[in-house]
Amino acid sequence: MRSLALCLLLMLAGCDLFERRPVQTLHEDVRFTVGSPYQAGGVVRYPREAYGVDETGLATIAPDYHGLTADGEIFDQTLLAAGHRTLQLPAIVQVTNLENGRQITLRLNDRGPSSPARLIALTKRSAELLDIHHDGTRVRLQMIDAETRQLAASLQASGPTLAVAAAPQGKVEAETLAPPGGAPQSSRVRQAAATPAPANGTAPVVEALPRRLPERIVQFPAAPGRLYIAAGSFSRADYASILVNRLAFLGARLTTSYTASRDSAFQIRIGPFDTVAEAEAMLTRAIQAGVNDAAIVVE
């Protein structure tokens, strides 16, 4: 009986050690993926490959998860990574905490968050570097097109090429820069253009990106902005006016953006709102009114 109890204790101890062992390598099935439409939080999402992405919204911190991310990596809270509802995976982006001006570079490698009121789900390490300690922090996401294209090309051409060895983390680097040019745009997406083939017909040489991106913090002035509901964008004012009239009971109004792409020049906004709770409540009403792609933005 004593021997059986000892064996059980050893088995439990072994399981505990296994669960706490840090992940040091990637699963072999890391892949470029866009994915099919799916439903989350009562809203259907349509993943797409896009570049020139510049979005604002609210961040959350991803819960612990023992499994694979949407692009085939082993989920790891210590990586500079995050989940996004619709963008291609993996993708390299800059994320700025608009409430304190901190900016880091991370890799989108998973789907999420499930709530339609959140733009991005950060790993715990990403949240630490951005000094984010609560759900609903205002952030800006900007895709780094060159590195995202490089990563996509490497994975599509020859399969998994992320460097599987964990790079030394070293110390966190930080610097202070002047504010970025232009006010943050709530959503500015440009569809991918075809990449011209090399003149000699050979495949381009692409270098694998490390699994652990450098922990480098860039400090900008804080620019928390105000919360709005983005309820649609159109290339023509008359098209936008139809939806504005339909959402008049919510206080929708038509605005013109001179920095967004031509097909998003006429934008519908509801707000502003003083609190996240107020914005979330209005977002729910907008979705119930049939605007499935409505989102909370910061302007």
PLM feature spans:
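Sec-dependent bacterial lipoprotein signal peptides
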Residues: 1-15
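A short beta-strand micro-motif
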Residues: 95, 229-231, 268
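Secreted/periplasmic proteins
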Residues: 15-222, 233-235, 239, 298
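Extracytoplasmic
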Residues: 204-224, 233-299
